[in-house]
Structures are given as structure tokens and as C-alpha cells.
Amino acid sequence: MRLWQWSIAVAICLVMVTEARLRRHHRKRRFVSSNFDEFYCGESAHAQSQFEEERESNSSKVSSVHSTQFNWGLDNTICIKLQNVVHVLKYERLEQRYPIENSYTFSVPLIDTNCKCHCYGFGTNDVCNVEKYADDRNCTTSSEFPTCYTKYHPAVEPLDCPVTSIPAKACCDIKLKPRDGRMFRAVKLQQPINDMIISHSIFANNSGKMMKVLGPDEFRINLLKGKEQFELTEYHRISVQLVASSPQQQLREGMYYFPEENHNDLREGKINEITESDLDKLGWYRRVGNDWQVATSGLLLRNAHKVVIKNCKGQVHMDQFSGTKNFVLRGTQYNDTYNERRVSDNNFVRSVKVDESSREITIVHEHGTAAQVSLKTDTRPNLTKSQSLLANFTGSITLDHDGNRMLNVTFFGVKGTVHIKMYVNDRKLIATFACTAQFGTSLKDDGSRISLPSTINQAQWVCILPDEQPTKSEICKWIPYEEKAMRTPRQEQSWSKGHSPCSQAECNSLKSGVSDLFPWIMNFDYFMAHGGDFTEWLKIGIHIVIAVGLLLLLILLFTKCLVPLACCSLSIPFKNRNKKKKKKNSSDY
């Protein structure tokens, strides 16, 4: 063979070898960094070791075991490659399951009152008969108001009564119904059961592309013991040892409630337990079977009722329920923002699910709890980690109404793990706070709420760096600080004005007179009872004009008619002084 033929053959061999190497390198790079659309690898091993142990409990055979340790965070993944297969373990979520001890249905009531006043000593028909309105009697209910109680007030101000030296008496019907037809469910929660849910998936290299061949299979790990061990046996044998503690952030044990039209809208506040009937808390107006009731046959509500009679004959009154909250009295507004704090507003709550059929409420934790994982395999695994990215971020630091100090951050173009550090100024001498956040497998815009210590009370220089990226990739900016005022509990219900129409024959049995026909002219009590708007002041002005006119008319009548008539009847000369003076002047001539 000639020299040039040898040269061509050698060149062809070199080209083939180079192409094969490039092909192998290309496949390897595709697995390591570029082809993670199907899965994401976020955790790096912090330790690897090899030792000998008996893998089979019924065998004395000793084999070589490879152990790999990881620190594992919520929403993150661990990837190990054994031969041509990639095992992916993902920390899916942390669930807190709260058993429901007991429950009841309640409503915020709308209350209306019908009060009648009876003047002492007038009328044979006593509408405020003590036997009829005794405190242990219920009044007639209706389809509109399913609950009704009576209240007898033996001594009230006798305004507009003929006898004002003796107190009048008032009798009231207190009617209740669910406000806007809305009903709520109160539940008592016990201490939670904490479960860590992880998933296992398997990917295999098929013609240079990673394809899912198994999973995801979920495993529920109870954190009560703090340690768990199990095995994965598909394709390869992997022994998993997991150590994790229960999260510190959880709902307190006690009473919660939710609207019946939205079970997952769990709320917290001052709520009566099933054995309580405190009018200062939610849940004192309850449904028992098909009836709506106030505990103790409404005795507490009756005792809380206060009434002021503004006009006994006009049946005008003002009333309120002292020491009672969480109701709507006729003509008043109900402000429920202070009691209706949603559980989902807590920074550690990702979602809420209420399942009354299983008597359980599940909270998916926002932060999770850190775990230490040890994977034992028969062969040494190849480890890989995906690239973390961050395009930009914005945020704010807030001290909210309830005293929670939070860093609210919106991340743009984020994937994987990012490290957050906060400084007093841009010199970055000492970090005031540091944490890590995970954002899963795909590039996205996402937000996060992070609890901060009480030492942070001003604007901060915040720097965020994607995991395992050079320092030049760090993004820093000033984040403003904002304080919101503390919540102020709503004030007790104000007085509400009511009018109870009553026929003359039924109430007080007084004959109609000028005062009844024209109460705005002759009755100041009516004016005081109905308020002092422009119309009432106009009426009182007309009253004054008429009174002045009547006074002038009486003066004229007295001086021009009554006095001369009296003088004439008593034979007393009554002559005008001007006439006497004129007569005297004429005699001088």
C-alpha cells in the first residue's frame, strides 16, 4: 500500500474516533445539564462513603455498600444515576392533618325588636302584662324570623305619659334570623399529625433522550418518630434512611370556623366551644336540629337587652344589647373584618382542605421541614445537579396588622435554588438575615413570603444569588420597609332606633287630642325622639312662630276686649287718656 493510501486510512480512523468521542461527550452533557424538561435535580450530596455490610437479614454474606448523604428541602429533588437509569426523589409537600374533635353550625344573627310602652294607670288592656312577657316565655315565630324571645322592662321613663311621676313599663319581642341566610361551621381542632410526602420516579436513556419509565410513586412518611427507613426495589435496590423533625409552625389547638358555601375558607377568631354560650364570641346563635336557638332559652340575650323609651304614646324607643358582639341590630352595620382572619393568611400555610366526612382538616405547609437523607446502593452512583437561574426580583418588607414581619419577594425567571442575604447597607459587611428558597423544575415567575426577625425594622440591601453560580450573577437592590397599624377591635353595637305601631285602643287607651293630631306642634318629646334634622327644626320654628302669634293675640284680646268689658260691668269709668287731655284743652278756652 502506498504512502498516500496509508495517510487516507489513518485520517479516516482519526475522524471516526473523534466523532465517537464527541457523540459520547454530547450524550453525557445532554444528561448532565441540558435535558431536564422531564425532571430536575436540585440537591447536591454533601458526603459519600463506601463500607461493607450484610444487606440480607437472613444471610451472612457481606457486600460492598455505597452511601450518599443529602440535606433535603421542600420542593427539591435528588437525582442518582445507576447504570443507564436515573432515580429521581422529590420532596413533594409537608401535610399537617388536624383531627376534628367536635363541631356545630352557627350564624351571625340579624336582630329586630318590637317594644311597646304602657303608661301607668291608663287603659284596661295592659299590653305589658308580666305573665305574657315573662322571661321564660317565647313569642310567636315566623318563617322570616325563626327565633323569638320576650323581655319585660318594669320601669322605663314615662315620656309623654299623662302621669310622669310614676315609671311606665315596656314589653319587647326580640326576633332573630340568620343574617343574609349565611351559615358557618365551627370546628375544634386537636394537635396535628405531620406527614412528609415524597415521590419516586425513574428515567431511562432512550436513543439519547431521557424518558420516564416509572412513577411517580408517592410515599407518606410520618414525622412522629423523627426517623424512617424504607427500600426502593424497582430496577435497582436503594435503601432510604430519612431523618426529619416536625415543623415548629402550626395552628394552635382550639376553635376555627368556615362558611358552609366554601369549606376550604378556614378562619380563626374568638369562637365559642360547643359547651360555651358567651355573647362576646362567635357562635352563640346556633342551629339545633331544624331550629335556631340561643343557649339557655335566650336568657343571656334577654338580660343583655337595654331599652330607652323616647316617646311612650308614640311608641318610639332606642335599644341595644350590652356586652354582646357578632350580630346585626336593625339599622346598624356589621364589621366582621377583625374576627374573620383566614388561616391561609398565615405565612406558613400553602393551602387548606376541609374534609368533614373524615373529620379532618389538612394544611399543606409552605416551608416544610429540613430532612437528612442517606441513600444506600450496591454500586457507586453518578450524581448530577441542574442549573439554578434568576432573571430579576422585586419585593418589600412589611410589619402587618398582626405583628408579622415578612419579606415579600416576587421572582422573575427563577428556577431551582436561590440564596437570599440581607444587609443594612450596600457595603455588605454583616448580613442581618440569610435564607434559601426552592422553586422547582421549570423556569417561571413566582412569589414567596419569608418570616423575618424583629431586629429588622428598616429598609434592607437584599442580594439574591442562584445556587452554584458565580458571584457576578448576584442581583442586589434596596427593599423598602413598611409598618401597618395594629388591628383595633370593633366597638360595641351603638343604640338603634325603633318604632312599634300601636292602635289607640290597644295601647294606653287615651283619647285623641291636639297633641295626637299635631304632635310636632304640641309635643317636644316627639321632636326629641325623632331626632333633630332640618324638617324637625323647621317644624319647631313654625311652633315658635305660632306660639308668639298666639301670645300677641292674647295680649290684644286682653287689652281691647276683656279689660274694657270688665270695667263696664263694674261701672268703672274707662276712658282713653288722650280723650281726657283733649277735653281739658277745650275747657281752657
Curated annotation (Swiss-Prot):
Segments forming a coiled coil: none
Residue ranges annotated as Cytoplasmic topological domain: 559-589
Q: What happens when the gene is disrupted?
A: Egg laying defective phenotype. AC fail to fuse in the majority of worms. RNAi-mediated knockdown in a daf-7 e1372 mutant background causes a severe defect in amphid sheath cell fusion induced by entry into dauer stage.
GO (cellular component) term, any one? apical plasma membrane
Which positions carry the signal peptide feature in this UniProt record? 1-20
According to the record, glycans are attached at N58, N138, N205, N335, N382, N392, N408
Query: Which keywords appear in this protein's UniProt record, sorted alphabetically?
Result: Cell membrane, Developmental protein, Glycoprotein, Membrane, Signal, Transmembrane, Transmembrane helix
Extracellular side, ranges: 21-537
Does Transmembrane helix count among this protein's keywords?
Answer: yes
Q: How does it sit in the membrane?
A: Single-pass type I membrane protein
Q: Which residues cross the membrane?
A: 538-558
Tissue specificity as recorded in UniProt: Expressed in amphid sheath cells.
Q: Where in the cell is it found?
A: Cell membrane; Apical cell membrane
Main location, first listed in the record: membrane
GO BP terms, alphabetized: regulation of egg-laying behavior; syncytium formation by plasma membrane fusion
Which protein family is it in?
Belongs to the EFF/AFF cell fusogen family.
- Primary role: Required for cell fusion events during development including the fusion of anchor cells (AC), vulval A and vulval D rings, and late epidermal seam cells. Required for amphid sheath cell fusion induced by entry into dauer stage.
Q: Name the chain's protein.
A: Cell fusion protein aff-1
Source organism: Caenorhabditis elegans
List the top taxonomic levels of the source. Eukaryota, Metazoa, Ecdysozoa, Nematoda, Chromadorea
Gene that encodes it: aff-1
